[in-house]
C-alpha cells in the first residue's frame, strides 16, 4: 500500500494600513486563496503485474481576512523596540472534487480499467473545508539600517480542520504552533568603497509543532536558516537563502527525515510620485 499527496494553495491579497499614532499602526488584508490538492493511494501485490490506483483531487477557492497591529517604541535615538500581532478568523475553503479508480501495469505503465466515481450520489462533489483561526505575536529590537534581533510565536487552531473528502485513517489534527528567532546584520549600508559591506546577512531558527498527528504522535519540525541580500541598482535586492531542517521522530517506530530548502528571490523597489525640483 502506498499513499502520496501533492499540491497546495496560492494567495492573492489586498492590504491597507493606517497610522493611529506615531508609534502605533493598524492594518487589514483581504486574501483570495486558490489551488488544487491531490491524494493518490495505490495497492500492488507481488507477482501481479497490474496495481490498483485511487486518485482524489480537490480544486479549492476561498476568502479570509487578517487583522494586524504594529507598535514602535523608540528606546534611544538609534535603537527601537518593535512589537507586532495579527489575527486570522476561522474560515473555510470551497472544494470541487473529482475521483477516479484505475488499474495500471507495473512493467509497461499501460492503463487497464478506469472508472470515474459518481461523487454527486454521495454528496461529495462539492464540499467545504473548515480552517481554524490563527494568531501570532512578535517582539524585536532594531537599530535602523544596521541590525535586528527578535522572536515570534504563532498558533493555528488546526484541531478545527475538517475535510470530508480527502482523509487518512492514521492522520488526525491538533492545534499547531511555531516559535522562531532570527535577525540580520548590515555592516555599512552607505559604503561606497566596499560592496560587501552593503550586503545584509540573515540567520534564524524555528521550532514547530505542525498540528498533524500520525498514529496519535505529534509531527514536529526544527529548522535553521541562513541568507544574504545583495543590493542591486536603485532600491532593489537579490535574496538567497538556505534552510536545513528535520521533520518527525524515530520514537515509536516512526520516521525522521532531514531536508534542505534553497530560497531565491528578488525584492524590486522604487520611489514613486517624486515631486519635481526643476521644470
Spans of features found by a protein language model:
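Outer-membrane beta-barrel porins/channels
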Residues: 1-279
Amino acid at each position: 500500500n502506498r499513499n502520496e499527496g501533492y499540491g497546495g494553495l496560492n494567495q492573492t491579497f489586498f492590504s491597507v494600513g493606517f497610522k493611529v499614532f506615531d508609534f502605533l499602526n493598524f492594518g487589514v488584508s483581504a486574501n483570495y486563496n486558490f489551488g488544487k490538492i491531490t491524494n493518490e493511494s495505490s495497492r500492488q501485490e507481488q507477482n501481479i503485474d497490474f496495481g490498483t490506483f485511487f486518485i482524489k483531487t480537490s480544486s479549492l477557492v476561498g476568502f479570509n481576512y487578517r487583522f494586524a497591529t504594529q507598535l514602535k517604541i523608540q528606546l534611544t535615538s538609534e535603537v527601537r523596540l518593535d512589537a507586532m500581532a495579527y489575527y486570522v478568523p476561522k474560515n473555510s475553503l470551497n472544494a470541487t472534487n473529482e475521483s477516479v479508480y484505475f488499474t495500471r501495469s507495473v512493467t509497461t505503465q499501460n492503463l487497464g480499467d478506469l472508472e470515474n466515481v459518481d461523487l454527486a450520489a454521495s454528496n461529495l462533489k462539492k464540499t467545504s473545508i473548515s480552517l481554524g483561526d490563527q494568531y501570532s505575536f512578535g517582539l524585536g529590537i532594531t537599530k535602523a539600517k544596521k541590525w535586528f534581533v527578535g522572536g515570534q510565536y504563532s498558533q493555528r487552531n488546526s484541531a478545527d480542520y475538517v475535510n470530508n473528502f480527502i482523509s487518512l485513517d492514521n492522520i488526525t489534527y491538533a492545534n499547531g504552533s511555531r516559535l522562531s528567532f532570527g535577525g540580520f546584520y548590515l555592516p555599512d549600508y552607505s559604503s561606497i568603497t566596499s560592496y560587501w559591506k552593503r550586503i545584509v546577512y540573515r540567520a534564524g531558527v524555528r521550532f514547530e509543532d505542525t498540528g498533524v498527528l500520525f498514529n496519535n504522535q505529534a509531527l514536529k519540525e526544527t529548522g535553521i536558516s541562513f541568507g544574504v541580500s545583495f543590493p542591486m541598482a536603485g532600491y532593489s535586492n537579490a535574496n538567497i537563502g538556505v534552510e536545513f531542517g528535520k521533520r518527525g521522530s524515530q520514537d515509536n517506530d516512526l520516521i525522521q527525515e532531514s531536508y534542505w530548502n534553497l530560497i531565491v528571490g528578488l525584492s524590486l523597489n522604487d520611489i514613486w510620485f517624486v515631486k519635481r525640483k526643476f521644470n
